[in-house]
Regions:
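Basic, amphipathic alpha-helical patches used to engage nucleic acids or provide basic targeting signals
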Residues: 64-127
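Short low-complexity, flexible loop/linker segments enriched in glycine and/or proline
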Residues: 50-52, 126-131
Length: 137
């Protein structure tokens, strides 16, 4: 007997446990700013239409996402935050992270990379956020 399987299902949670824990820390320190999770890189930066490689540049960024983006009251992105677990040590992830860092640098959007931990010190994360934003502000 053939049983049709559904090709898709709704995930129970948007964030992993590590991401949820870190999100709560961010919530406690960003004040009136808005935090967005799992934002597509192509929604943060655009590929210049005049550039010869526009299509391939867009194709590259459309499948990448940033763990968290903090926006101001106008919903303008002010900083990207990546939560780096052990997978970021793999050669393919190291290359991907280097590319993402460079893309965000070109687009003038600062990025803070935070290693995954069991617990986070909100004051330390706040200090890191401010230090990362300092050259921009």
């Amino acid at each position: 007997m053939y049983v049709a399987l559904r090709p898709f299902f709704r995930r129970k949670y948007l964030l992993t446990n590590a991401e949820k824990d870190f999100y709560q820390v961010l919530r406690s320190i960003v004040g009136s700013h808005t935090i967005w999770a799992k934002v597509r890189l192509a929604d943060l930066v655009g590929a210049d239409k005049r550039h010869l490689l526009r299509k391939s540049n867009f194709d590259y960024i459309k499948s990448k996402h940033i763990d968290f983006v903090i926006c101001d009251a106008a919903l303008s992105p002010i900083i990207a935050v990546e939560l780096d677990d052990s997978s970021h040590q793999r050669p393919d992830r190291v290359a991907r992270d280097r590319d993402v860092n460079r893309i965000l640098e070109i687009a003038s959007l600062p990025i803070l990379r935070v290693p995954v931990r069991r617990t986070y010190d909100g004051a330390e994360i706040a200090k890191q956020l401010l230090a990362t934003l300092q050259p921009v502000v």
